[in-house]
């Protein structure tokens, strides 16, 4: 379970970075060269999703819970926005959903 969660976390970071760098280019006037590491990050994101031993749709559904938490961590650390009680509750619910799916994928 811990290995799966850590892999989902790294996967989420790759996805967020791969989307954030083009956002910097489009919204903040960063160099177009940032699109190269963005593309590499998104390619790594896709590859990481293939490392799980479950059906793709089930992996994507479970990954979503960790993605929500990682995005909120990004919101706090990178964007500097303080998390609300609603953010924390949403993250907890998302992680519970991920846990239920991951525990169940070995039993089907």
Curated annotation (Swiss-Prot):
Localisation per UniProt entry: Cell inner membrane
Periplasmic side: 1-5, 52-60, 106-108
Keywords: Cell inner membrane, Cell membrane, Membrane, Transmembrane, Transmembrane helix
Membrane topology: Multi-pass membrane protein
Cellular compartments per GO CC: plasma membrane
Matches recorded under Pfam families: UPF0060
Cytoplasmic side: 27-30, 82-84
Highest taxon in the source lineage: Bacteria
Entries under InterPro entries matching the protein: UPF0060
Transmembrane segments: 6-26, 31-51, 61-81, 85-105
Family: Belongs to the UPF0060 family.
Record-linked PANTHER family: UPF0060 MEMBRANE PROTEIN YNFA
Protein name: UPF0060 membrane protein YnfA
The organism of origin for this protein: Salmonella typhimurium (strain LT2 / SGSC1412 / ATCC 700720)
